[in-house]
Protein backbone atom coordinates (compact mmCIF):
# COMPACT_ATOMS: atom_id res chain seq x y z
CA UNK A 1 0.00 0.00 0.00
CA UNK A 2 1.15 3.52 -0.79
CA UNK A 3 0.64 5.14 2.61
CA UNK A 4 1.59 8.62 1.43
CA UNK A 5 -1.17 8.45 -1.16
CA UNK A 6 -3.63 7.00 1.38
CA UNK A 7 -2.87 9.84 3.83
CA UNK A 8 -3.18 12.41 1.04
CA UNK A 9 -6.59 10.97 0.09
CA UNK A 10 -7.78 11.20 3.71
CA UNK A 11 -6.58 14.80 4.14
CA UNK A 12 -8.06 15.79 0.77
CA UNK A 13 -11.54 15.01 2.11
CA UNK A 14 -11.17 17.92 4.54
CA UNK A 15 -9.01 20.52 2.76
CA UNK A 16 -9.07 22.37 -0.56
CA UNK A 17 -5.70 21.20 -1.90
CA UNK A 18 -5.00 18.71 -4.70
CA UNK A 19 -3.72 15.20 -3.97
CA UNK A 20 -0.26 15.68 -5.51
CA UNK A 21 0.38 18.86 -3.52
CA UNK A 22 -0.63 17.13 -0.28
CA UNK A 23 1.49 14.06 -1.04
CA UNK A 24 4.60 16.18 -1.67
CA UNK A 25 4.23 17.76 1.78
CA UNK A 26 4.10 14.44 3.64
CA UNK A 27 7.34 13.70 5.49
CA UNK A 28 8.92 10.74 7.26
CA UNK A 29 9.76 11.90 10.81
CA UNK A 30 13.38 11.61 12.00
CA UNK A 31 12.34 9.57 15.06
CA UNK A 32 9.90 6.64 15.15
CA UNK A 33 8.23 7.96 18.33
CA UNK A 34 7.07 10.93 16.25
CA UNK A 35 5.12 8.64 13.93
CA UNK A 36 5.70 6.86 10.66
CA UNK A 37 4.45 9.75 8.51
CA UNK A 38 3.90 13.42 9.30
CA UNK A 39 1.93 16.16 7.56
CA UNK A 40 2.93 19.80 8.27
CA UNK A 41 -0.13 22.05 8.34
CA UNK A 42 1.63 25.39 7.68
CA UNK A 43 0.53 25.66 4.06
CA UNK A 44 -3.12 25.14 5.00
CA UNK A 45 -3.19 28.31 7.13
CA UNK A 46 -4.06 30.61 4.23
CA UNK A 47 -6.62 28.21 2.78
CA UNK A 48 -8.38 27.42 6.09
CA UNK A 49 -7.62 30.76 7.81
CA UNK A 50 -6.54 29.05 11.02
CA UNK A 51 -3.30 28.59 12.93
CA UNK A 52 -1.40 25.42 11.87
CA UNK A 53 -1.70 23.98 15.42
CA UNK A 54 -5.50 24.29 15.32
CA UNK A 55 -5.68 22.78 11.83
CA UNK A 56 -3.64 19.76 13.00
CA UNK A 57 -6.01 19.25 15.95
CA UNK A 58 -9.12 19.58 13.76
CA UNK A 59 -7.81 17.12 11.17
CA UNK A 60 -6.79 14.61 13.85
CA UNK A 61 -10.40 14.36 15.04
CA UNK A 62 -11.92 14.36 11.54
CA UNK A 63 -9.76 11.83 9.67
CA UNK A 64 -10.79 8.18 9.32
CA UNK A 65 -8.29 6.12 11.30
CA UNK A 66 -8.74 2.76 9.54
CA UNK A 67 -5.34 1.16 8.87
CA UNK A 68 -3.66 3.37 11.47
CA UNK A 69 -2.78 2.52 15.04
CA UNK A 70 -3.37 6.16 15.93
CA UNK A 71 -3.15 9.71 14.62
CA UNK A 72 -1.74 12.46 16.84
CA UNK A 73 -1.20 16.18 16.52
CA UNK A 74 2.07 17.62 17.76
CA UNK A 75 2.16 21.38 17.33
CA UNK A 76 1.60 22.15 13.63
CA UNK A 77 2.24 18.52 12.63
CA UNK A 78 -0.24 15.72 12.11
CA UNK A 79 1.56 12.46 12.94
CA UNK A 80 0.37 9.10 11.58
CA UNK A 81 1.24 5.82 13.29
CA UNK A 82 0.43 2.94 10.96
CA UNK A 83 -1.06 -0.34 12.13
CA UNK A 84 2.14 -2.43 12.19
CA UNK A 85 0.44 -5.72 11.30
CA UNK A 86 -1.51 -4.26 8.38
CA UNK A 87 1.55 -2.34 7.18
CA UNK A 88 3.76 -5.46 7.30
CA UNK A 89 1.14 -7.57 5.55
CA UNK A 90 0.64 -5.06 2.73
CA UNK A 91 4.37 -4.51 2.24
CA UNK A 92 5.56 -8.12 2.38
CA UNK A 93 2.70 -9.48 0.26
CA UNK A 94 3.39 -6.89 -2.44
CA UNK A 95 7.13 -7.63 -2.51
CA UNK A 96 6.60 -11.40 -2.69
CA UNK A 97 3.87 -11.04 -5.33
CA UNK A 98 5.84 -8.63 -7.54
CA UNK A 99 9.21 -10.37 -7.18
CA UNK A 100 11.80 -8.99 -9.61
CA UNK A 101 9.30 -6.35 -10.77
CA UNK A 102 8.92 -4.87 -7.26
CA UNK A 103 9.74 -1.17 -7.51
CA UNK A 104 8.29 -0.76 -11.00
CA UNK A 105 5.92 2.14 -11.68
CA UNK A 106 4.24 3.83 -14.63
CA UNK A 107 5.48 7.35 -13.82
CA UNK A 108 7.26 7.59 -17.17
CA UNK A 109 4.65 5.90 -19.35
CA UNK A 110 4.67 7.38 -22.87
CA UNK A 111 7.81 9.46 -22.24
CA UNK A 112 11.30 8.94 -23.64
CA UNK A 113 14.52 9.69 -21.76
CA UNK A 114 17.87 9.77 -23.59
CA UNK A 115 20.95 9.01 -21.50
CA UNK A 116 24.40 9.63 -22.99
CA UNK A 117 27.15 7.88 -21.04
CA UNK A 118 30.53 6.14 -21.23
CA UNK A 119 31.64 7.65 -24.61
CA UNK A 120 35.25 6.40 -24.69
CA UNK A 121 37.74 7.49 -27.33
CA UNK A 122 38.50 5.08 -30.16
CA UNK A 123 42.03 3.62 -30.09
CA UNK A 124 42.51 4.52 -26.44
CA UNK A 125 42.13 2.20 -23.44
CA UNK A 126 39.43 2.34 -20.80
CA UNK A 127 40.92 4.02 -17.75
CA UNK A 128 39.40 4.27 -14.28
CA UNK A 129 37.83 7.64 -15.11
CA UNK A 130 35.68 6.08 -17.86
CA UNK A 131 33.90 3.89 -15.34
CA UNK A 132 32.49 6.92 -13.51
CA UNK A 133 30.30 7.99 -16.46
CA UNK A 134 29.58 4.35 -17.38
CA UNK A 135 28.41 3.36 -13.88
CA UNK A 136 26.29 6.50 -13.34
CA UNK A 137 24.72 6.34 -16.80
CA UNK A 138 23.98 2.62 -16.60
CA UNK A 139 22.28 3.06 -13.22
CA UNK A 140 20.20 6.05 -14.40
CA UNK A 141 19.23 4.05 -17.50
CA UNK A 142 17.99 1.15 -15.35
CA UNK A 143 16.15 3.38 -12.86
CA UNK A 144 14.28 5.35 -15.52
CA UNK A 145 13.38 2.02 -17.17
CA UNK A 146 12.03 0.80 -13.81
CA UNK A 147 9.76 3.86 -13.70
CA UNK A 148 8.20 3.00 -17.04
CA UNK A 149 10.06 5.44 -19.28
CA UNK A 150 11.23 4.45 -22.76
CA UNK A 151 14.97 4.85 -22.30
CA UNK A 152 17.60 5.24 -25.01
CA UNK A 153 21.18 4.51 -23.94
CA UNK A 154 23.61 6.50 -26.10
CA UNK A 155 27.34 5.80 -26.34
CA UNK A 156 28.65 8.98 -28.04
CA UNK A 157 31.97 7.48 -29.11
CA UNK A 158 35.00 9.73 -29.54
CA UNK A 159 35.63 8.47 -33.06
CA UNK A 160 36.61 11.67 -34.92
CA UNK A 161 39.19 14.44 -34.68
CA UNK A 162 42.76 15.41 -35.53
CA UNK A 163 44.12 12.59 -33.35
CA UNK A 164 43.11 10.12 -36.07
CA UNK A 165 45.43 11.85 -38.54
CA UNK A 166 48.24 11.39 -36.04
CA UNK A 167 47.26 7.76 -35.53
CA UNK A 168 47.31 7.06 -39.29
CA UNK A 169 50.78 8.63 -39.48
CA UNK A 170 51.94 6.54 -36.50
CA UNK A 171 50.40 3.39 -38.02
CA UNK A 172 52.24 3.86 -41.32
CA UNK A 173 55.55 4.35 -39.51
CA UNK A 174 55.65 2.01 -36.53
CA UNK A 175 52.77 -0.47 -36.33
CA UNK A 176 53.40 -4.11 -35.40
CA UNK A 177 50.58 -5.94 -37.24
CA UNK A 178 50.88 -9.06 -35.10
CA UNK A 179 50.59 -6.99 -31.90
CA UNK A 180 47.67 -5.05 -33.39
CA UNK A 181 45.68 -8.24 -33.95
CA UNK A 182 46.57 -9.67 -30.55
CA UNK A 183 46.01 -6.57 -28.36
CA UNK A 184 44.69 -3.75 -30.58
CA UNK A 185 44.21 -1.03 -27.95
CA UNK A 186 47.65 -1.64 -26.44
CA UNK A 187 49.34 -1.41 -29.84
CA UNK A 188 47.36 1.67 -30.93
CA UNK A 189 48.21 3.37 -27.64
CA UNK A 190 51.90 2.44 -28.05
CA UNK A 191 52.19 4.02 -31.49
CA UNK A 192 50.09 7.04 -30.45
CA UNK A 193 52.40 7.74 -27.50
CA UNK A 194 55.44 7.16 -29.75
CA UNK A 195 54.07 9.72 -32.23
CA UNK A 196 53.96 12.39 -29.51
CA UNK A 197 57.41 11.49 -28.23
CA UNK A 198 58.86 11.72 -31.75
CA UNK A 199 56.91 14.92 -32.56
CA UNK A 200 58.64 16.67 -29.65
CA UNK A 201 61.93 16.04 -31.48
CA UNK A 202 60.53 16.54 -35.00
CA UNK A 203 57.58 19.02 -35.11
CA UNK A 204 57.00 18.29 -38.82
CA UNK A 205 55.22 15.11 -37.70
CA UNK A 206 52.35 17.31 -36.47
CA UNK A 207 51.96 18.64 -40.04
CA UNK A 208 51.91 15.09 -41.35
CA UNK A 209 49.17 14.23 -38.84
CA UNK A 210 47.10 17.21 -39.99
CA UNK A 211 47.59 16.16 -43.60
CA UNK A 212 46.29 12.65 -42.92
CA UNK A 213 43.27 14.02 -41.05
CA UNK A 214 42.51 16.27 -44.03
CA UNK A 215 42.57 13.14 -46.20
CA UNK A 216 40.18 11.48 -43.78
CA UNK A 217 37.82 14.47 -43.91
CA UNK A 218 37.83 14.56 -47.73
CA UNK A 219 36.97 10.86 -48.01
CA UNK A 220 40.34 9.39 -49.01
CA UNK A 221 39.70 5.63 -49.35
CA UNK A 222 42.91 4.48 -47.64
CA UNK A 223 42.51 6.88 -44.69
CA UNK A 224 38.82 5.92 -44.32
CA UNK A 225 39.68 2.21 -44.34
CA UNK A 226 42.28 2.66 -41.58
CA UNK A 227 39.88 4.77 -39.51
CA UNK A 228 37.19 2.08 -39.82
CA UNK A 229 39.69 -0.59 -38.81
CA UNK A 230 40.77 1.38 -35.73
CA UNK A 231 37.10 1.85 -34.82
CA UNK A 232 36.12 -1.81 -35.32
CA UNK A 233 39.11 -3.11 -33.35
CA UNK A 234 38.39 -0.67 -30.52
CA UNK A 235 34.67 -1.52 -30.40
CA UNK A 236 35.49 -5.21 -30.08
CA UNK A 237 37.67 -4.41 -27.07
CA UNK A 238 35.06 -2.05 -25.58
CA UNK A 239 32.40 -4.77 -25.87
CA UNK A 240 34.62 -7.12 -23.86
CA UNK A 241 34.82 -4.54 -21.05
CA UNK A 242 31.09 -3.76 -21.24
CA UNK A 243 30.33 -7.50 -20.95
CA UNK A 244 32.37 -7.67 -17.73
CA UNK A 245 30.46 -4.66 -16.38
CA UNK A 246 27.06 -5.86 -17.65
CA UNK A 247 26.49 -2.63 -19.60
CA UNK A 248 24.56 -2.30 -22.87
CA UNK A 249 23.66 0.57 -25.22
CA UNK A 250 20.92 1.24 -27.75
CA UNK A 251 23.10 3.43 -29.99
CA UNK A 252 26.82 3.64 -30.73
CA UNK A 253 26.50 6.74 -32.94
CA UNK A 254 29.67 8.68 -32.18
CA UNK A 255 31.09 12.01 -33.29
CA UNK A 256 31.69 10.81 -36.86
CA UNK A 257 27.97 10.02 -37.24
CA UNK A 258 27.22 13.76 -37.11
CA UNK A 259 29.72 14.82 -39.81
CA UNK A 260 26.96 15.24 -42.41
CA UNK A 261 24.51 16.80 -39.95
CA UNK A 262 26.46 19.91 -38.93
CA UNK A 263 25.86 22.10 -41.99
CA UNK A 264 22.16 22.24 -41.14
CA UNK A 265 23.03 23.50 -37.64
CA UNK A 266 25.49 26.12 -38.91
CA UNK A 267 23.01 27.36 -41.54
CA UNK A 268 20.21 27.60 -38.97
CA UNK A 269 22.37 29.69 -36.65
CA UNK A 270 23.37 31.92 -39.58
CA UNK A 271 19.76 32.33 -40.74
CA UNK A 272 18.71 33.33 -37.22
CA UNK A 273 21.47 35.93 -37.02
CA UNK A 274 23.22 34.21 -34.13
CA UNK A 275 26.62 33.58 -35.75
CA UNK A 276 29.19 36.37 -35.70
CA UNK A 277 32.87 36.45 -36.64
CA UNK A 278 35.42 36.66 -33.83
CA UNK A 279 39.16 36.36 -34.52
CA UNK A 280 38.35 34.51 -37.73
CA UNK A 281 36.08 31.98 -36.02
CA UNK A 282 32.27 31.77 -36.23
CA UNK A 283 30.81 32.10 -32.73
CA UNK A 284 27.57 32.70 -30.84
CA UNK A 285 28.07 35.54 -28.36
CA UNK A 286 26.87 34.71 -24.85
CA UNK A 287 28.07 37.83 -22.97
CA UNK A 288 24.52 38.57 -21.80
CA UNK A 289 24.52 35.23 -19.98
CA UNK A 290 27.95 35.63 -18.32
CA UNK A 291 29.51 33.02 -20.59
CA UNK A 292 32.33 33.20 -23.13
CA UNK A 293 31.40 32.88 -26.82
CA UNK A 294 30.40 29.43 -28.05
CA UNK A 295 32.72 28.61 -30.96
CA UNK A 296 30.80 26.85 -33.74
CA UNK A 297 33.41 26.94 -36.53
CA UNK A 298 37.15 27.48 -36.07
CA UNK A 299 39.10 29.98 -38.17
CA UNK A 300 39.91 27.29 -40.75
CA UNK A 301 36.23 26.37 -41.04
CA UNK A 302 36.61 23.15 -39.03
CA UNK A 303 33.92 22.06 -36.59
CA UNK A 304 34.55 21.47 -32.89
CA UNK A 305 32.82 19.62 -30.03
CA UNK A 306 30.09 22.22 -29.67
CA UNK A 307 29.11 21.89 -33.34
CA UNK A 308 28.74 18.14 -32.98
CA UNK A 309 26.83 18.39 -29.70
CA UNK A 310 24.41 20.89 -31.26
CA UNK A 311 23.89 18.54 -34.21
CA UNK A 312 23.52 15.54 -31.88
CA UNK A 313 20.93 17.30 -29.71
CA UNK A 314 18.83 18.27 -32.74
CA UNK A 315 19.10 14.77 -34.23
CA UNK A 316 18.07 13.15 -30.94
CA UNK A 317 15.08 15.43 -30.51
CA UNK A 318 13.93 14.69 -34.05
CA UNK A 319 14.57 10.94 -33.75
CA UNK A 320 13.42 10.20 -30.19
CA UNK A 321 11.26 13.23 -29.30
CA UNK A 322 12.71 12.99 -25.80
CA UNK A 323 11.05 14.17 -22.60
CA UNK A 324 14.51 14.56 -21.09
CA UNK A 325 18.02 14.27 -22.55
CA UNK A 326 20.77 13.54 -20.03
CA UNK A 327 24.51 13.93 -20.61
CA UNK A 328 26.65 12.02 -18.10
CA UNK A 329 29.96 13.81 -18.62
CA UNK A 330 32.61 15.00 -16.13
CA UNK A 331 32.00 18.23 -14.19
CA UNK A 332 34.85 20.10 -15.98
CA UNK A 333 32.56 20.12 -19.06
CA UNK A 334 29.79 22.04 -17.23
CA UNK A 335 30.48 25.32 -19.06
CA UNK A 336 30.54 23.59 -22.45
CA UNK A 337 27.06 22.16 -21.91
CA UNK A 338 25.69 25.44 -20.55
CA UNK A 339 26.87 27.08 -23.77
CA UNK A 340 25.41 24.37 -26.01
CA UNK A 341 22.03 24.40 -24.24
CA UNK A 342 21.92 28.22 -24.32
CA UNK A 343 22.66 28.29 -28.07
CA UNK A 344 19.83 25.80 -28.66
CA UNK A 345 17.52 27.98 -26.59
CA UNK A 346 18.53 31.15 -28.48
CA UNK A 347 17.85 29.31 -31.74
CA UNK A 348 14.25 28.93 -30.59
CA UNK A 349 14.35 25.32 -29.39
CA UNK A 350 12.35 25.38 -26.15
CA UNK A 351 13.23 21.75 -25.55
CA UNK A 352 16.77 22.92 -24.70
CA UNK A 353 15.40 23.21 -21.15
CA UNK A 354 14.89 19.43 -21.19
CA UNK A 355 18.62 18.85 -21.75
CA UNK A 356 20.57 18.20 -18.54
CA UNK A 357 24.27 17.83 -17.84
CA UNK A 358 24.97 15.28 -15.09
CA UNK A 359 28.50 16.01 -13.90
CA UNK A 360 30.76 13.94 -11.69
CA UNK A 361 34.08 14.25 -9.88
CA UNK A 362 37.55 12.84 -10.42
CA UNK A 363 39.02 9.44 -9.71
CA UNK A 364 42.14 9.61 -7.58
CA UNK A 365 44.36 6.59 -7.43
CA UNK A 366 47.86 6.66 -5.95
CA UNK A 367 48.22 10.34 -6.95
CA UNK A 368 48.59 9.45 -10.63
CA UNK A 369 47.15 11.71 -13.30
CA UNK A 370 45.18 10.19 -16.15
CA UNK A 371 47.04 11.39 -19.24
CA UNK A 372 46.46 9.21 -22.31
CA UNK A 373 49.02 11.11 -24.39
CA UNK A 374 51.90 10.09 -22.15
CA UNK A 375 50.55 6.61 -21.51
CA UNK A 376 50.43 7.17 -17.74
CA UNK A 377 46.99 5.69 -17.18
CA UNK A 378 45.44 3.58 -14.45
CA UNK A 379 43.68 1.10 -16.72
CA UNK A 380 40.24 -0.21 -15.83
CA UNK A 381 41.34 -3.73 -16.76
CA UNK A 382 44.13 -3.53 -14.17
CA UNK A 383 41.74 -2.19 -11.54
CA UNK A 384 39.21 -4.98 -12.15
CA UNK A 385 41.92 -7.65 -12.21
CA UNK A 386 43.37 -6.45 -8.92
CA UNK A 387 39.94 -6.24 -7.29
CA UNK A 388 39.01 -9.79 -8.36
CA UNK A 389 42.41 -11.18 -7.26
CA UNK A 390 42.18 -9.53 -3.84
CA UNK A 391 38.61 -10.84 -3.43
CA UNK A 392 39.73 -14.36 -4.34
CA UNK A 393 42.46 -14.13 -1.68
CA UNK A 394 39.79 -13.30 0.93
CA UNK A 395 37.59 -16.21 -0.24
CA UNK A 396 40.54 -18.65 -0.13
CA UNK A 397 41.28 -17.51 3.40
CA UNK A 398 37.70 -17.57 4.76
CA UNK A 399 35.88 -20.19 2.67
CA UNK A 400 38.35 -22.17 0.50
CA UNK A 401 35.77 -24.89 -0.30
CA UNK A 402 33.28 -22.43 -1.84
CA UNK A 403 31.87 -23.63 -5.17
CA UNK A 404 32.56 -21.51 -8.28
CA UNK A 405 34.80 -19.25 -6.21
CA UNK A 406 36.39 -17.62 -9.29
CA UNK A 407 32.94 -16.59 -10.55
CA UNK A 408 31.95 -15.38 -7.06
CA UNK A 409 35.21 -13.39 -6.78
CA UNK A 410 34.49 -11.77 -10.14
CA UNK A 411 30.97 -10.71 -9.10
CA UNK A 412 32.15 -9.36 -5.74
CA UNK A 413 35.28 -7.70 -7.17
CA UNK A 414 33.48 -5.96 -10.04
CA UNK A 415 30.49 -5.12 -7.83
CA UNK A 416 32.77 -3.59 -5.19
CA UNK A 417 34.26 -1.19 -7.74
CA UNK A 418 30.89 -0.14 -9.21
CA UNK A 419 29.47 0.31 -5.70
CA UNK A 420 32.39 2.57 -4.79
CA UNK A 421 31.71 4.81 -7.80
CA UNK A 422 28.03 5.11 -6.89
CA UNK A 423 28.22 5.27 -3.08
CA UNK A 424 28.70 9.01 -2.58
CA UNK A 425 27.32 12.08 -4.31
CA UNK A 426 28.53 11.98 -7.92
CA UNK A 427 30.11 15.45 -7.65
CA UNK A 428 32.59 14.11 -5.07
CA UNK A 429 36.00 12.77 -6.06
CA UNK A 430 36.74 9.09 -5.51
CA UNK A 431 39.90 8.02 -3.70
CA UNK A 432 40.53 4.28 -3.95
CA UNK A 433 41.33 2.42 -0.74
CA UNK A 434 41.34 -1.34 -1.23
CA UNK A 435 40.94 -2.08 2.46
CA UNK A 436 37.69 -0.13 2.56
CA UNK A 437 36.35 -1.09 -0.89
CA UNK A 438 36.66 -4.85 -0.37
CA UNK A 439 35.62 -4.92 3.29
CA UNK A 440 32.71 -7.21 4.16
CA UNK A 441 31.80 -4.81 6.93
CA UNK A 442 30.66 -1.21 6.68
CA UNK A 443 29.08 0.62 3.77
CA UNK A 444 30.51 -1.42 0.90
CA UNK A 445 29.38 -3.54 -2.02
CA UNK A 446 30.69 -6.79 -0.48
CA UNK A 447 28.75 -6.03 2.74
CA UNK A 448 25.47 -5.70 0.81
CA UNK A 449 26.22 -8.80 -1.29
CA UNK A 450 27.10 -10.71 1.90
CA UNK A 451 23.77 -9.64 3.43
CA UNK A 452 21.98 -11.07 0.39
CA UNK A 453 23.92 -14.35 0.62
CA UNK A 454 23.16 -14.51 4.35
CA UNK A 455 19.42 -14.13 3.72
CA UNK A 456 19.61 -16.72 0.94
CA UNK A 457 21.34 -19.15 3.30
CA UNK A 458 18.51 -18.79 5.85
CA UNK A 459 15.88 -19.55 3.21
CA UNK A 460 17.81 -22.54 1.82
CA UNK A 461 17.98 -24.09 5.32
CA UNK A 462 14.25 -23.68 6.02
CA UNK A 463 12.25 -26.94 6.04
CA UNK A 464 8.61 -27.91 6.66
CA UNK A 465 7.46 -24.32 6.90
CA UNK A 466 3.88 -23.55 7.89
CA UNK A 467 1.67 -22.00 5.21
CA UNK A 468 0.04 -19.86 7.90
CA UNK A 469 1.47 -16.42 8.66
CA UNK A 470 0.43 -13.70 11.10
CA UNK A 471 2.00 -10.32 10.36
CA UNK A 472 0.82 -8.83 13.65
CA UNK A 473 3.58 -10.95 15.22
CA UNK A 474 6.21 -8.71 13.58
CA UNK A 475 5.88 -6.25 16.42
CA UNK A 476 9.48 -5.66 17.53
CA UNK A 477 11.34 -2.46 16.74
CA UNK A 478 13.86 -4.25 14.48
CA UNK A 479 11.14 -6.04 12.50
CA UNK A 480 9.03 -2.94 11.95
CA UNK A 481 12.04 -0.77 11.03
CA UNK A 482 13.02 -3.34 8.40
CA UNK A 483 9.49 -3.45 6.97
CA UNK A 484 9.44 0.37 6.77
CA UNK A 485 12.74 0.43 4.88
CA UNK A 486 11.53 -2.25 2.44
CA UNK A 487 8.33 -0.28 1.78
CA UNK A 488 10.34 2.79 0.80
CA UNK A 489 11.91 1.33 -2.36
CA UNK A 490 9.72 3.14 -4.91
CA UNK A 491 10.17 6.48 -3.16
CA UNK A 492 13.95 6.10 -3.23
CA UNK A 493 13.98 5.24 -6.94
CA UNK A 494 11.90 8.34 -7.68
CA UNK A 495 14.13 10.52 -5.51
CA UNK A 496 17.23 9.16 -7.29
CA UNK A 497 15.82 9.83 -10.78
CA UNK A 498 14.44 13.25 -9.80
CA UNK A 499 17.86 14.30 -8.53
CA UNK A 500 19.76 12.25 -11.16
CA UNK A 501 21.77 10.87 -8.24
CA UNK A 502 22.33 7.06 -8.08
CA UNK A 503 24.01 7.43 -4.66
CA UNK A 504 20.51 7.89 -3.17
CA UNK A 505 19.69 4.32 -4.19
CA UNK A 506 23.12 3.06 -3.11
CA UNK A 507 22.59 4.50 0.37
CA UNK A 508 19.11 2.96 0.42
CA UNK A 509 20.47 -0.52 -0.39
CA UNK A 510 22.99 -0.08 2.44
CA UNK A 511 20.08 0.81 4.76
CA UNK A 512 18.19 -2.35 3.72
CA UNK A 513 21.26 -4.50 4.43
CA UNK A 514 21.88 -2.80 7.79
CA UNK A 515 18.23 -3.12 8.84
CA UNK A 516 18.13 -6.77 7.79
CA UNK A 517 21.29 -7.60 9.78
CA UNK A 518 19.99 -5.74 12.85
CA UNK A 519 16.78 -7.77 12.66
CA UNK A 520 18.60 -11.08 12.15
CA UNK A 521 21.12 -10.42 14.94
CA UNK A 522 18.27 -9.63 17.36
CA UNK A 523 15.77 -12.36 16.43
CA UNK A 524 15.90 -16.05 15.64
CA UNK A 525 14.23 -17.11 12.40
CA UNK A 526 14.61 -20.89 12.08
CA UNK A 527 15.16 -21.91 15.72
CA UNK A 528 11.59 -21.21 16.89
CA UNK A 529 8.85 -23.36 18.42
CA UNK A 530 6.17 -20.96 17.14
CA UNK A 531 5.72 -22.26 13.57
CA UNK A 532 3.54 -19.32 12.51
CA UNK A 533 6.12 -16.79 13.72
CA UNK A 534 8.84 -18.79 11.93
CA UNK A 535 6.89 -18.66 8.64
CA UNK A 536 6.15 -14.96 9.11
CA UNK A 537 9.78 -14.07 9.77
CA UNK A 538 10.85 -16.15 6.78
CA UNK A 539 8.52 -14.04 4.64
CA UNK A 540 10.34 -10.97 5.96
CA UNK A 541 13.71 -12.55 5.10
CA UNK A 542 12.49 -13.38 1.56
CA UNK A 543 11.28 -9.80 1.13
CA UNK A 544 14.64 -8.43 2.26
CA UNK A 545 16.40 -10.76 -0.17
CA UNK A 546 14.19 -9.56 -3.04
CA UNK A 547 14.64 -5.85 -2.34
CA UNK A 548 18.44 -6.14 -2.03
CA UNK A 549 18.50 -8.02 -5.35
CA UNK A 550 16.27 -5.46 -7.10
CA UNK A 551 18.26 -2.56 -5.66
CA UNK A 552 21.64 -3.96 -6.70
CA UNK A 553 20.24 -4.70 -10.17
CA UNK A 554 19.41 -1.00 -10.58
CA UNK A 555 23.01 -0.16 -9.63
CA UNK A 556 24.33 -2.62 -12.22
CA UNK A 557 25.63 -5.11 -9.62
CA UNK A 558 25.07 -8.89 -9.53
CA UNK A 559 24.03 -10.74 -6.40
CA UNK A 560 25.99 -13.69 -5.02
CA UNK A 561 23.91 -16.67 -3.87
CA UNK A 562 26.62 -18.16 -1.60
CA UNK A 563 29.72 -16.76 0.10
UniProtKB/Swiss-Prot annotation:
Record keywords: Aminoacyl-tRNA synthetase, ATP-binding, Cytoplasm, Ligase, Nucleotide-binding, Protein biosynthesis
Reaction(s) catalysed (UniProt annotation): tRNA(Arg) + L-arginine + ATP = L-arginyl-tRNA(Arg) + AMP + diphosphate
Any GO BP annotation: arginyl-tRNA aminoacylation
Primary localization class, coarse: cytoplasm
Record's GO cellular component terms: cytoplasm
PROSITE patterns: AA_TRNA_LIGASE_I
Enzyme Commission code: 6.1.1.19
An example Gene Ontology molecular-function term: ATP binding
CDD domains according to UniProt: Anticodon_Ia_Arg (cd07956), ArgRS_core (cd00671)
Residue interval(s) of motif 'HIGH' region: 120-130
Localization annotation: Cytoplasm
Subunit record text: Monomer.
Family listed: Belongs to the class-I aminoacyl-tRNA synthetase family.
Name of the protein: Arginine--tRNA ligase
Encoding gene per record: argS
